[in-house]
Amino acid sequence: LRKACDQVLKIKGFDTSLGIPHFAGISLNQIPGDPDSVKGSKVRGVYWTRPDSTGKEVIRDSKINESLYSEFVQEFKDTYFHYVYKELSKIFKLGRVRLLLKEPRSTLSWHRDPEPRLHIPIYTNPGAIMVVDSIAKHLPADGSVWITNNTKYHNAFNGGEEDRIHLVACVLDYKFN
């Protein structure tokens, strides 16, 4: 996984123009024939947050039809991620599949997403923590696949001094009990 990540980063660096400090992404799949589907806010995606003391929930960004993301990006087809994508697609109905970077000593907002997420940690450190519904967990980079209920309020923060990079996929058919 690390070798594949390094290959992708040599082909295309992280898109840091997503409007969220210390966060970046690279899309591994796209809407067939639509290279614009992997740019800008489409890498980030829609989410809901409660940004201030009123506690009022607001939506950020435009909704994305995740089910349209079914074509692996051509320039990454020679990486191990193409194999991983094909294997995961046999088990799950996937939406966008991305490499997501959380830079050292940084955090996201407390937010929720429209669907669960599949995480495969690639680069991490003990200070990189995922918090879902007030439960904190470090996801080690040991090859495991984690399904997180991102429809609940959650956060990812990197309290370490090294980058945190996960392969993250939107899972469209997964139901939590």
Give the ranges of each region predicted by the language model.
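Non-heme Fe(II)/2-oxoglutarate
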Residues: 1-84
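Long, contiguous binding/interaction regions
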Residues: 97-99, 126, 151, 163-165, ...
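Short beta-strand His + acidic residue motifs that chelate non-heme Fe in jelly-roll/DSBH
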Residues: 108-111, 128-130, 139, 148-160
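Short, conserved beta-strand element in jelly-roll/cupin
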Residues: 101, 112-128
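A short beta-strand-loop-beta hairpin characteristic of the jelly-roll/cupin
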Residues: 121-141
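Residues that flank catalytic or metal-binding motifs in active/ligand-binding sites
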Residues: 95, 114-116, 163
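A short glycine-rich, His/Asp/Glu-containing loop-to-beta-strand
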Residues: 83-104
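A short hydrophobic beta-strand segment most commonly corresponding to one strand
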Residues: 118-121, 145-147, 161-177
